[in-house]
């Protein structure tokens, strides 16, 4: 659409450079009368080369819808707009939201929602069959809750590319039998192939976090592992087993189905009763969910 392209070009010519150095960021914070909120996990990404790398490797193409959460002062937002993505940004901090409106309000491919990203109805924002991706330097304090929110959406993103705390990234990409492997690993990997793409040092942020960070990619699986209608049961079973991850699965399943049914379920699945939950693969949890539903008839509404 020529008119849209013309508006975008005009916006890009008139915008101020957003690749701030640390001093410029501090000056901007002071001008807004604010400090980064550690309770909100606000660590602003400054490295222009890293921002360019994120945009090149995030999996999105020009014209695609991209969801950004916690845009802050817009360093990543500017890059996403420049790449001709249709950006929907969600900002919780009203001062930063005002800043973003002034900075990006004239861009035809930018939409701002001032809200708590963990409370947004994503099925309304991106209805079924609406394709979109999510790219963000996620506020670390909300990362696990926000990711779980997208996992529960009836229309999850085609891909996600997030800056996360290194420990969180390792949990999401963890394999069975490791300490990091847990309920969130299983729930995420049910839908996505997850990989830690790059470890990022604290120095590229202001203020620098106390731990290393990681850029993590999530690619939606082409084939569903879980039959439709069993999502609620799957989540329940995964959480129940990992809530007591050091116990044997025979005892844990027995609490759900009864001892006799648990023995039959394990026999039909071919699982030893003395296995620990963290030894089960995502596919194993799918098999368990199907069998437990056959015997127990869990509520999936």
Task: Kindly give the residue locations of the regions a language model identified.
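Short helix-coil junctions and helix-kink-helix linkers
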Residues: 254-255
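Active-site-proximal catalytic alpha-helix in oxidoreductases
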Residues: 243
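Catalytic cores of RNA-modifying enzymes
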Residues: 2-3, 7-240, 264-267, 278, ...
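Primarily EF-hand calcium-binding motifs
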Residues: 271-272
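Alpha-helix N-cap and coil->helix boundary residues
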Residues: 260-261
């Amino acid at each position: 659409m020529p008119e849209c392209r013309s508006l975008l070009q005009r916006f890009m010519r008139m915008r101020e450079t957003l690749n701030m150095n640390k001093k410029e960021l501090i000056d901007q914070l002071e001008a807004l009368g604010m400090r980064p909120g550690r309770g909100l996990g606000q660590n602003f990404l400054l490295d222009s080369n890293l921002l360019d790398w994120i945009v090149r490797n995030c999996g999105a193409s020009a014209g695609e819808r991209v969801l950004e959460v916690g845009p802050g002062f817009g360093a990543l937002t500017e890059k996403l707009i420049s790449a001709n993505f249709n950006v929907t940004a969600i900002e919780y901090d009203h001062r930063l939201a005002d800043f973003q409106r002034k900075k990006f309000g004239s861009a035809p491919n930018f939409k701002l929602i001032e809200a708590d990203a963990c409370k947004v109805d994503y099925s309304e924002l991106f209805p079924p069959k609406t394709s979109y991706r999510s790219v963000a330097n996620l506020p670390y304090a909300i990362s696990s809750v926000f990711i779980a929110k997208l996992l529960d959406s009836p229309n999850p993103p085609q891909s996600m590319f997030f800056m996360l705390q290194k420990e969180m990234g390792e949990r999401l990409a963890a394999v069975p039998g490791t300490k990091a492997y847990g309920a969130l690993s299983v729930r995420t990997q049910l839908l996505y192939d997850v990989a830690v793409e790059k470890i990022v040092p604290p120095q590229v942020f202001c203020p620098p976090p106390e731990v290393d960070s990681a850029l993590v990619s999530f690619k939606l699986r082409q084939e569903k592992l879980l039959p439709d209608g069993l999502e609620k049961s799957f989540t329940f079973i995964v959480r129940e087993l990992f809530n007591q991850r050091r116990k044997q699965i025979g005892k844990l399943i027995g609490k759900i189905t009864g001892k006799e049914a648990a023995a039959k379920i394990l026999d039909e699945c071919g699982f030893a009763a003395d296995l620990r939950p963290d030894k089960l693969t995502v596919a194993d949890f799918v098999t368990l969910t199907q069998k437990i539903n056959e015997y127990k008839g869990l509520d999936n509404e």
